[in-house]
Structure formats: C-alpha cells, structure tokens
Amino acid sequence: MTPIVFIDRDGTLIEEPPDFQIDAYEKLRLVNGVIPALLKLRDAGYHFVIVTNQDGLGSPTYPQASFDGPNALMLQIFSSQGIVFRDVLIDRSWPADNAPTRKPGIGLMVAYLQDRDIDWARSAMVGDRPTDLQFAENLNIRGFQLRTPQFGGDWDWDGIAHTLADAPRRAVVQRHTKETNIRVEIDLDGAPQARITTGLPFFNHMLEQIAKHAGISLQISAVGDLHIDEHHTIEDTGLALGQAVRQALGDKRGIGRYGFDPPQLPWQVSGAAAHGGFTLPMDETQASAVLDFSGRPYFVFEGTFVRERVGDMPTELVPHFFRSLCDASGMNLHLSVHGDNDHHKVEACFKALARALRQALQRHGHVLPSTKGAL
C-alpha cells in the first residue's frame, strides 16, 4: 500500500503573495526547505497529490492563462529535481459558493477514497491554513500546518519530513484463540527493554535475550493452556511476535534486511569450525544465525539437544518457536548450534538470532533493499 502526502499549493509549495494570486512568473517563489523535504519523503515511499483552492480560476479576474504558465513552471522545477506529483486537484469555486469540492470539503477526493491501495494510516495533509487541517480531519489523516506570518502554524518542511519518514516502527498484536491469549507490543527503535510473562520462566528469559541483544523494546503477555502442555503457548508466542515484527517493519524501506556476521569482527571463527552467519560463543557452545527479511519465510536448523527440556521449556519446541517466528514475520533464517550444555545451546541460539536481528533491522536511509521493488 502507498502512503500519500496531500499538499496545498499556495503558501505551502510556493510563497503566497499579498494578493493571494500567483498569476505572473515574477511571483513564483518556492517555500524554504520544500525540495529536500519532498525528496526525503519520496525516498521513504510517499506519493504526492496537490489539492488547492483557486478562487474564481478561469474568471475575468483570474484568467486561466495567467495561472497555467507559473503553475507549469513550478511543476517543471519540481520534476527537474526528481519530484513528481501523482495528481493536481483544483477547485475553482468562490468561498461563497460553499462547494463540496472546496477545501475543507473532500469532494475532489472521491477517487482516492475508493482506492484500496492507499495507506491511509501513514498518509497526511500539509497546508498553511486552518482549513487544510480541517480537510485532513475530514479525511481522517494527520494534518500539518506550515508556520506562516499570515495564518500561524507550528511546522516547517524539515520537521514534517522527519516526522513522516523517520516515524518510530511500532506494532501491537493481539492473538486470541481457544488455546492462548497473547499480546505483543514492539518498538524497533525504542530503548532496549523487556517485560515478558508467558507462564514459562525459562522461555521468558530467552525472549528477554531477543529484546536485549536486538536492541528493541518488547512486551509480551501470554496466557495459554499450560495445563495441557507448553506447545500452544510457545508456538503462538512465536507467531504473534513474528506478526508484530512484520507490522512494525512496514514496507521495509531503509532496513539492512540481512543479518550476518561481518568478516572483520574479531570473534568470527575461521577454519573447519567456521559457521556462516552471526557467530557467537557461550562457553563451550557456538551458535550461528543468518537471516533475510525477504518476505519468503524459510527456516533451516542444524543442531541437537540431549535433554528433554531446559527449565520448563521442551527442547523440541526450540526450533519450532523459530519456525513459527519465521512463518509470521516473512523471515528466512538459518540457525545452527553445537556444544555440550543444552542450556548454553538454547540461549546461544536466541542470542545469535537477536544479534542478527539488530543488524537487519537497522535503518540506513530510505531506499528499499531490493531490485524487485517490494519485499
């Protein structure tokens, strides 16, 4: 789905003159900061639509020809910098006409309201007047009023671009079945912290490792049918956590995508004992994780456990948890472990995954890390 920034023209993209009509080339002035802000939003996946009231356009007091030349030059300037507008919607009525197509009315928006490919949750309206904020409210999207001497306002273009393009990646998932009731809250950019309650203390401890070593904020509350066994609680927690990660990532623009062990790190093992991926030791144990947020879930596990359970967590459910996590998050994960102590082996698996996640989740600009155009 595509987010759209709906943008007023006069006073928002271009400076508004005292007579409120840009009907001559010499009146054309771009608003400060608009081009770098729109480039940042474009790179974050936003499309742009101009929505403007032009009082009496086409009348003797505002001839169409006087409007067309400066408007075409404005669009050409933006286009020369890589900024293209998906549409230009113009209402030509007078305020006294009270037309439904005139902002803050949304009569010009019928086609967009019927478009199911628009990400309305991330879309926004930017303008310089209170009527632009009312327009945003009527569309049920966020509104930003640019700071101007004429109409006030609290925002500049740099702040708007930062707020929309660098928005925190958060998600809340509630999974309720006849077997479990699970709530996951995740903030991929929050301070590393964890509040975990699953009814399984060792499993809690492992999930805390993900939050700590991935560098994310994670809250999980799971109530399951532990009187039967642990399977449903562990499996459904993996599914809910995976769904939360997927939702928080959004369209995945700017992420590292891959989690692996950079070869220059001093703790990477070489030679016959080397394992591909993010490799870490825990005493006699060594675990490796390599992952890809490709959107194609796949899980490969290499390792064995001797004990039936570690604490209150059955060891057969360790790979099952990771498989559930992959299925719901759209992640491809290869995980391997070898050692002597099953406690160390389980914990090293969770820590290796977490460190690979840290790398894959980091943002580096706003470019989508795929040649296909979607992940």
From Swiss-Prot:
Source species of the chain: Xylella fastidiosa (strain M12)
Protein name per UniProt: Histidine biosynthesis bifunctional protein HisB
Xref: InterPro entries: HAD-like_sf, HAD-SF_hydro_IIIA, HAD_sf, His_synth_bifunc_HisB, HisB_N, Histidinol-phos, IGPD_sf, ImidazoleglycerolP_deHydtase
Family: In the N-terminal section; belongs to the histidinol-phosphatase family.
Keywords: Amino-acid biosynthesis, Cytoplasm, Histidine biosynthesis, Hydrolase, Lyase, Magnesium, Metal-binding, Multifunctional enzyme
Chief location bin: cytoplasm
EC assignment: 3.1.3.15, 4.2.1.19
Gene Ontology MF terms in the entry: histidinol-phosphatase activity; imidazoleglycerol-phosphate dehydratase activity; metal ion binding
Active site positions: D8 (nucleophile), D10 (proton donor)
